[in-house]
Amino acid sequence: MSSALSIRQLTKTYGNGFQALSGIDLDVAEGDFFALLGPNGAGKSTTIGILSTLVNKTSGTVNIFGHDLDKSPAALKRSIGVVPQEFNFNQFEKTFDIVVTQAGYYGIPAKVAKERAEQYLTQLGLWDKRDVPSRSLSGGMKRRLMIARALVHEPRLLILDEPTAGVDIELRRSMWTFLTELNEKGITIILTTHYLEEAEQLCRNIGIIDHGTIVENTSMRNLLGQLHVETFLLDLKNNLSVAPQLLGYPSRLV
């Protein structure tokens, strides 16, 4: 299987001397749904920033679909769509216009840009909000707007940095469904998250990053097989007639 992303010995040291990345090696196959899991400060966002050309690497190589970051940054950037963690669009611009404007940055003709904006806003449940300023959208709607904007130039690789942060459970699951359908159409997806449950639901392979280093890179199946089952002993005042449901862990009470 061909490679969508290949990273070799990637490092990043900031001006204050803080080393955010310490020689990362990472491969993501074309068509994969890949999770990059780690705590705050682990290096996830720095890695995404380098891939999206917003952060300059210190050393190492990055190759996306055959495009080298140093030799062909424009072609590399065109092949990816990035959904950042923070909202970074004009809060006074209309929802529809935000997506169309993004398409223009990639030289997409206006007619095609408008058709794609309608397509993705409809798929993400935002078409009825097309004429309202983005500032009036809820947090979940803004997340979906950023996904539509990232997809409008039809990238081969979609990178999402904590896309469901602050999103309620119902909306989170609808976004999971949409992303799964995208991946089934052949788009390679890299997802950064804090949540193992999210990675388990969506991803086939996973890399775990901590203190700027990849500490695990394996299939989701292998990782879950390595996890130990923890047993909790509860001393209850009264007997229970039925076992309680553990929210977030359906059918896992043993």
Where are these regions (language model features)?
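A short, flexible loop at the N-terminus of ABC-type nucleotide-binding domains that lies
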Residues: 1-7, 11-23, 73
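Conserved ABC transporter NBD signature motif
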Residues: 60-68, 75-76
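Conserved ABC ATPase "signature" region
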Residues: 100, 104, 111-129
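A short, proline-enriched helix->beta-strand linker immediately N-terminal to the Walker B motif
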Residues: 152-156
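Catalytic Walker B motif of ABC-type/P-loop ATPase nucleotide-binding domains
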Residues: 158-161
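ABC transporter nucleotide-binding domain
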Residues: 176-254
